[in-house]
Curated annotation (Swiss-Prot):
Keywords: Carbohydrate metabolism, Glycogen biosynthesis, Glycogen metabolism, Glycosyltransferase, Transferase. Belongs to the glycosyl hydrolase 13 family. GlgB subfamily. GO terms for biological process: glycogen biosynthetic process. This is 1,4-alpha-glucan branching enzyme GlgB. The active site is at D416 (nucleophile), E469 (proton donor). The lineage of its organism: Bacteria, Pseudomonadati, Pseudomonadota, Gammaproteobacteria, Alteromonadales.
Length: 743
């Protein structure tokens, strides 16, 4: 028997509710006082329900049966003589089953006014704790609190496995003042799939992935996933304490850049990714053995297109499904730390893709992106640029950075494409960009965001490293923010990379005419805190592998590559090398397959790998190679002008008591005997490393491990020695025992 709707519903409210057009659902559904406080009424909307009883959660007793208002599923009824609100569930009889459902519309808002204020201001560092899908408990009831920012939406519902994707079932509570929509849902299980269903002002409906989802489906599917309740138990206290006490600009730092999807694969055809447990067992011991201090991961925020390598993420808070879940990733980071390896994450804050389930026109308006395409569209990648002037967008990004550092214990972030953030005319022709308020080309809002980001992160997470990929001469990238700098800890040295790789590709006969390409970087080496990077970008898109860039036969290629690495590790600045380069991968990097590990069956590749390993271990053992990376006193040319022989000689200095190291690099196949070099100290010297040694695949030309200084001034030094300089080789020479008075 049906009850007239107007007995329980305001005029027309029942129809609006059925059509999904009633947005203030909390004023209608749930438990409400009626008859001037003399009664209680409960209303609910449950499609296909046959009957609904109200059950007290406290004692499990039935309080009342609700009247069926219509066949579409509206139920309502008064609760006898009860006048004081109480917690209840709805016992719902369906054609095939009976379910007990805790009514979500009986709960008050769970949002905190301070959180809301900080989010709108642009300074929220923990927005992920109240936005997205979070396990919460209120009034003794456990459930998932869903919350999303969509200020211009007409209506927002949460849809998912738990409501058969019915957009009218769980319409969310709207907060007009701040644009947030929320709903606390009991009866939701871990792993449930969900989306936010938005009705735009023009009436269009769009299902969107949760911008703050911490887990997502694998492509081509794109639902968000309710996270597990269990969290990883960390065991890296010793590392975190050591990290906080380390001044990384004075410490050895050599990073191994890794694309997790192609470092190594498994399966008969190499069709399967390694999972995090595989990586714990295989990648970490390898990196440790090779002597790298850090791993830098290419982006792992969820991304739909494999070919983007992660640089077009849709789920910025969701670790990609490809290698496991969030707890698996945490276990991997934890294992890195327990092995004494730091881990840096590539972070994409410069742009986002146009995938329709993502951030693009999220609530029917340009919410995350700038509405003017001259400022909001990236011409190179056909992606969208964040509106850094909007407080909520800044909070979204700032909180995301904090999320990876706080929840996953990453040791820093490497920001991709910073140059595109700094300039309004980046890759744009005249007329295609908007000047700033002063008529200039600098993106003042993005600059301010980067300054605040670095300032906040360094303050909140002691010992982290913030690294910028910045390819222009923008001044002050690594200057402190109180000196009007951007506040990064390090900047990739793109100038050094371009010059040195250009030099590497030249015939040895003509390198004498391009000598400056290896010396010029020392003219500006101390203007920023540089990291020398040979990244994935240098071995893709037809550029070929490092080995492929080098002219000559195989012997010359491998010898040149070893000498180049010697120059790189001797040059001031921290180091980054892309995976595969450490053993001389021949083919260009392919993200769809494993590195060519079979090459290590051949001695030349073994030799390069062994050379890199020994360079790294020497780098960590000798303070002269890192402690004064950013001080002029840490480096001195012996001879930077020997273009005729293409030989470079220099000294690296540590602090008082640290042994200096002399580097001699020969970039031609010519063997030099009786070659005199200046030495900073008197006494016997040891040939620490020789890239031409037979163990590295060389011709075994050198100094039999020892060099003796004589009192003959040379190259500005009071001592010198005659040495043998191997062809296409690198020598690293240092005091054999003790230290005498330096010049």
């Amino acid at each position: 028997m049906m009850t007239q709707a107007n007995a329980y519903f305001y005029d027309g409210a029942d129809v609006a509710l059925l059509n999904g057009q009633y947005t203030d659902v909390f004023s209608l559904l749930g438990m409400h006082s009626a008859n001037e406080g003399k009664a209680l009424i409960v209303r609910c909307f449950l499609r296909n329900a046959l009957s609904v009883d109200v059950i007290s959660i406290k004692d499990g007793r039935k309080v009342a049966s609700l009247d069926k208002v219509n066949e579409q599923g509206l139920f309502a009824g008064t609760l006898g003589r009860r006048v004081k609100p109480f917690l209840y569930l709805l016992r719902v009889e369906y054609p095939q089953c009976q379910l007990d459902i805790v009514d979500p519309y009986q709960f008050d808002s769970l949002l905190n006014s301070d959180d809301i204020y900080l989010f709108g201001e642009g300074s929220a560092e923990r927005a992920y704790e109240f936005l997205g899908a979070n396990w919460r408990q209120t009034q003794g009831v456990e459930g998932v609190h869903f919350c999303v920012w969509a200020p211009n939406a007409k209506r927002v519902s949460v849809v998912g496995d738990f409501n058969h994707w019915d957009d009218t079932r769980h319409v969310m509570r709207q907060h007009l003042a701040n644009g947030l929509w929320e709903l606390f849902l009991p009866n939701v299980v871990e792993g449930a799939h969900y989306k936010f269903d938005l009705v735009y002002q023009n009436g269009e409906r769009h299902a969107k992935s949760d911008p703050m989802a911490t887990q997502m489906e694998c492509a081509p599917h794109n639902a968000s996933i309710v996270p597990p309740k269990a969290h990883h138990s960390w065991n890296d206290t010793a590392w975190m304490s050591k990290r906080a006490a380390t001044a990384w600009h004075k410490a050895p730092m050599s990073a191994y850049e890794v694309h997790l999807g192609s470092w190594r694969r498994k399966g008969e055809q190499g069709e399967q990714y390694l999972d995090y447990q595989d990586l714990i067992e295989q990648l970490i011991p390898y990196v440790k053995e090779q002597g790298f201090t850090h791993i830098e991961l290419m982006p792992i925020s969820e991304f739909p297109f494999d070919g983007s390598w992660g640089y077009q993420p849709v789920g910025l808070y969701a670790p990609t499904h490809r290698f496991g879940d969030a707890n698996g990733l945490k276990a991997f980071v934890d294992a890195c730390h327990q092995a004494g390896i730091g881990i840096i994450l590539d972070w994409v804050s410069a742009h986002f893709p146009k995938d329709p389930h993502g951030l693009v026109r999220f609530d029917g308006t340009c919410l995350y992106e700038h509405e003017d395409p001259r400022k909001g569209t990236h011409p190179d990648w056909d992606t969208l640029i964040y509106n850094y002037d909007r407080g909520e967008v800044r909070s979204f990004l700032l909180s995301n950075a904090c999320y990876w550092l706080r929840e996953f214990h990453f040791d820093g972030l490497r920001l991709d494409a910073v140059s595109s953030m700094l300039y309004l005319d980046y890759s744009r022709e005249p007329g295609q960009w908007l000047p700033n308020t002063y008529g200039g080309r600098e993106n003042l809002e993005a600059i301010n965001f980067l300054q605040i980001l670095n300032q906040r992160l360094y303050q909140a997470f002691p010992g982290i490293c913030m690294i910028a990929e910045e390819s222009t001469a923008f001044a002050g990238v690594t200057k402190p923010t109180d000196q009007q700098g951007l506040g990064f800890g390090f900047k990739w040295n793109m100038g050094w990379m371009n010059d040195s790789l250009s030099y590497l590709g030249r015939d040895p006969l003509y390198r004498q005419f391009h000598h400056h390409q290896l010396t010029f970087s020392l003219m500006y080496a101390y203007t920023e805190q540089f990291m020398l990077s040979v990244s994935h970008d240098e071995v893709v898109h037809g550029k070929g592998s490092l080995l492929h860039k080098i002219p000559g036969d195989d012997w010359q290629k491998f010898a040149t590559l070893r000498a180049y690495y010697g120059f790189m590790w001797g040059h001031p600045g921290k180091k980054l090398l892309f995976m595969g380069c450490e053993f001389g991968q021949r083919n260009e990097w392919n993200h769809n397959q494993s590195l060519d590990w079979h090459l290590l069956a051949y001695e030349p590749h073994q030799g390069v790998q062994r050379w890199l390993k020994d360079l790294n271990h020497l780098y960590q053992a000798m303070p002269a190679l890192s402690v004064q990376d950013y001080e002029g006193a840490g480096f001195s040319w012996l001879d930077c002008e020997n273009s005729r022989d293409s030989i470079f000689t220099f000294v690296r200095y540590g602090l008082a008591g640290d042994a200096p190291l002399v580097f001699v690099i020969n970039m031609t196949p010519q063997l030099h005997t009786g070659f005199r070099i200046g030495l900073p100290l008197a006494g016997d010297y040891r040939e620490y490393l020789n890239s031409d040694s037979q163990i590295y695949g060389g011709s075994n030309q050198g100094n039999a491990g020892t060099v003796v200084a004589e009192s003959l001034p040379w190259q500005g030094m009071a001592q010198s020695a005659l040495i043998t300089v191997p062809p296409l080789g690198c020598l690293v020479i240092g005091p054999a025992t003790g230290l005498a008075e330096a010049n």
